[in-house]
């Protein structure tokens, strides 16, 4: 009653400040639209009489209500149905208490205050709508820092000493997750300024309405202290359908004077909800099905599910101009609602009612070529010393021959790798390697390959000046695929290796074996086979790349660092270069 008397005094003091209507009328006289002037002029006459006319009568609802609307909802001004709740406003605390008491009596529910406004400094931010206040063309400021939130007695448990004891007991007894009731009551107190109302007719140009809104805000900022205004309490009350996971109480008073039949639209919604939902829910059936789909795909985080639901509602269910407001809990569920639904779907997955769908991957988790985040995979190859110091070392890293097409045997080996790097393994049917190294007589500079599992072949004699204690790097494959040799034994490229046995005659052309700084030394090979001399056990990291312009998009590896022994006497004459292999074709 005290607040009601204060509100009456505020409203009755407004006629004293007669300068406010004059300022508003003069400011709006220059406007091209005349409707703002008429709305302001209609408020000038009653102010001189000294009676309170700013309190609005019981207005018609924003949308027609059905016959089964509860009596407590009919007491709200401008009442509208939002999901399983009804929202309207009251103009006094007495009216608000009356509606809340009537609602509790008819629903037989007990509520606890979860959140209450704090006595902070008065708000000065002008708004046209908010999460709790719909748009009606009247600007307002919040009269409290926060809204009043009341939860059902079967709602979520809150932090406290008793909660710690209960959580310890449940952890010891391996108690399962218990879903809680999501029903809530929201109360928001605001201060409206009907003197600065703008039209809400959809036929009026939006640009004109925006200009009027800017004018109203400008005048309100200048006269906010003397503007007065009307206090309103916007209330959102849930129905019995909003209560879940507990037995409903038997109402002592009937919800309506007579049992009216349900409308066809409501009956259809009820049938769809019963058929598609795992359990009774206030969520829209398509939203509940989306949660089930996300959880079955492995998305179980609450906020990740909420983000996907918002995108689903705003982009798929509705057009941009028809998206419901965020306070419609049927399409924008709370965190508690999402937790409950995730838990129900997880239980269904365990019992086998819902099958886990691992084939469908969400679009946000799929790697595409436009994402730019290319995964780099590292393979470490260790070159170890042989049994004899004077024998070369053969390291086997794959067999890639200069063929026009890939043989069918390596395809099963490449298929699992293609799932990790789709950009690299897109052209498996056109395996072609272009050699960069060439001998002076036009033949290719080749690297010797030992295709047999023996790790100690006879020593190589290249150009007659290779010493016996040098270790040559031979690229090969531990599993010989049985493909034919690249070049005949009597070819020009095999002539420098006449002393090699037949087991070492398999030759492989290497694409970009030597870096840019080593290209000049490539011409000094004089038909000799390129060799890399290694010491005792060097580890070479190999990275998979796909940004090089001359990259062969098969199984390609890159040697970033190759160490050489500085003590070898023949390094300065035969193997002086550092190998920086951008691409080495390996299977």
Swiss-Prot record:
Compositional bias annotation for Polar residues: 1-10, 437-452
Q: Which UniProt keywords apply?
A: Activator, DNA-binding, Nucleus, Transcription, Transcription regulation
The protein's superkingdom reads: Eukaryota
Q: Which residues form a coiled coil?
A: none
One Pfam family cited in the UniProt record for this chain = ALS2CR8
The compartments listed are: Nucleus
Q: What is its main location?
A: nucleus
Q: Which InterPro entries match?
A: CaRF (IPR029309)
Q: Offer one example of a GO biological process linked to this entry.
A: positive regulation of transcription by RNA polymerase II
Keyword Transcription regulation in record: yes
- GO MF terms held by the record: DNA binding; DNA-binding transcription activator activity, RNA polymerase II-specific; DNA-binding transcription factor activity, RNA polymerase II-specific; RNA polymerase II cis-regulatory region sequence-specific DNA binding
GO CC annotations? granular component; nucleus
For this protein, the parts annotated as crossing the membrane are none
State the residue spans of region: Disordered: 1-23, 437-466, 479-499
What does the record's free text say on domains? The N-terminus is necessary for DNA-binding. The C-terminus is necessary for transcriptional activation.
Q: What is this protein called?
A: Calcium-responsive transcription factor
Q: Which organism is it from?
A: Rattus norvegicus (Rat)
Q: What is the lineage of its organism?
A: Eukaryota, Metazoa, Chordata, Craniata, Vertebrata
GN (gene name): Carf
């Amino acid at each position: 009653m005290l607040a009601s008397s204060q509100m009456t005094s505020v409203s009755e003091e407004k006629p004293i400040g007669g300068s406010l209507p004059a300022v508003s009328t003069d400011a709006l006289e220059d406007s091209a639209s005349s409707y703002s002037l008429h709305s302001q002029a209609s408020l000038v006459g009653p102010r001189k009489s000294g009676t309170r006319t700013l309190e609005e009568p019981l207005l018609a609802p924003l949308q027609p209500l059905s016959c089964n609307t509860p009596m407590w909802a009919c007491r709200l001004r401008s009442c509208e149905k939002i999901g399983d709740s009804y929202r309207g406003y009251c103009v006094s605390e007495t009216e608000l208490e009356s509606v809340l008491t009537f609602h509790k009596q008819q629903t037989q529910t007990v509520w606890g205050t979860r959140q209450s406004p704090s006595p902070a400094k008065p708000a000065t931010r002008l708004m046209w709508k908010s999460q709790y206040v719909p748009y009606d063309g009247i600007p307002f400021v919040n009269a409290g820092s926060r809204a009043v939130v009341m939860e059902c007695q079967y709602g979520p448990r809150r932090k406290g000493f008793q909660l710690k004891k209960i959580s310890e007991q449940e952890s010891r007894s391996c108690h399962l997750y218990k879903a809680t009731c999501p029903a809530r009551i929201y109360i928001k107190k605001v201060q409206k300024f009907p003197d600065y109302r703008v039209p809400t007719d959809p036929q009026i140009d939006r640009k004109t309405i925006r200009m009027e809104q800017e004018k109203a805000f400008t005048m309100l900022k200048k006269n906010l202290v003397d503007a007065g205004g009307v206090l309103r309490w916007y209330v959102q009350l849930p129905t019995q359908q909003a209560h879940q996971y507990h037995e409903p109480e038997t109402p002592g008073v009937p919800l309506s004077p007579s049992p009216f039949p349900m409308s066809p639209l409501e009956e259809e919604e009820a049938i769809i909800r019963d058929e598609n939902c795992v359990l009774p829910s206030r969520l829209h059936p398509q939203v509940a099905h989306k949660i089930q789909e996300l959880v079955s795909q492995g998305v179980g985080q609450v906020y990740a599910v909420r983000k996907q639901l918002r995108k689903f509602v705003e982009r798929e269910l509705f057009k941009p101009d028809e998206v419901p407001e965020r306070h419609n809990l049927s399409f924008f569920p709370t965190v508690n609602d999402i937790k409950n639904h995730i838990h129900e779907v997880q239980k269904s997955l365990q019992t086998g009612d819902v099958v886990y769908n691992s084939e469908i991957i969400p679009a946000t988790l799929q790697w595409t070529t436009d994402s730019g985040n290319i995964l780099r995979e590292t393979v470490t190859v260790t070159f170890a010393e042989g049994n004899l110091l004077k024998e070369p070392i053969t390291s086997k890293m794959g067999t890639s021959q200069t063929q026009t097409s890939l043989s069918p045997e390596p395809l099963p080996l490449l298929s699992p790798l293609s799932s990790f790097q789709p950009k690299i393994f897109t052209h498996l049917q056109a395996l072609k390697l272009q050699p960069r190294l060439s001998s002076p007589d036009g033949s290719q500079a080749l690297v010797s390959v030992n295709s047999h599992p023996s790790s100690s072949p006879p020593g190589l004699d290249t150009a007659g000046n290779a010493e016996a204690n040098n270790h040559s790097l031979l690229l090969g494959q531990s599993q010989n695929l049985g493909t034919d040799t690249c070049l005949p034994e009597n070819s020009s490229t095999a002539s420098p290796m006449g002393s090699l046995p037949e087991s070492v005659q398999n030759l492989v052309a290497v694409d970009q074996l030597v870096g840019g700084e080593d290209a000049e030394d490539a011409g000094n090979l004089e038909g000799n086979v390129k060799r890399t001399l290694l010491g005792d056990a060097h580890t070479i990291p190999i990275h998979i790349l796909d940004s090089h312009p001359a990259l062969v998009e098969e199984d390609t590896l890159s040697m970033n660092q190759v160490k050489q022994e500085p003590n070898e006497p023949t390094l300065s004459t035969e193997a002086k270069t550092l190998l920086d292999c951008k691409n080495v074709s390996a299977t």
